[in-house]
Amino acid sequence: MKIWVDADACPVVIKEILFRAAERTQTETILVANHAMRIPPSKYISRLQVSSGFDVADDEIVKRIAKGDLVITGDIPLASEVIDNGGQALNPRGELYTTENIRSILNVRDFMDTMRSSGVEMSGGPPPLSQTDRQNFANNLDRILAQNKAG
């Protein structure tokens, strides 16, 4: 299993958790972004810079994942494609997207997008990551990595 990170919008604190987990579990972790980024020196952590453009990083992740790989993303359409291709998707708040929940989450996202595009005022975006969110992310990441190690 590899970990692929949709790194353009991934919070720094989540990247730091991923860096520690990659080292601890010796799991290859690839950050995909359309800009240069700094990563710690590690044989388990690498970066892949793609050209700028709408969904270029997402498309590259979908093209490269293998069945069972984990993708870290808050992008619901990307998570849906990952699941359709046999991967796993975890968002930075620690919510695991699954075959059981991705369709309803995608439907809500599409509904909200339709509301915004029709001119309905929507209150701001999601709140900042809380300590609980960070803990949920770390716990679910550890659980997924342990399951992968167990086979």
Swiss-Prot record:
Pfam families: DUF188. This is UPF0178 protein PSHAb0045. PANTHER family: UPF0178 PROTEIN YAII. Belongs to the UPF0178 family. InterPro entries: UPF0178.
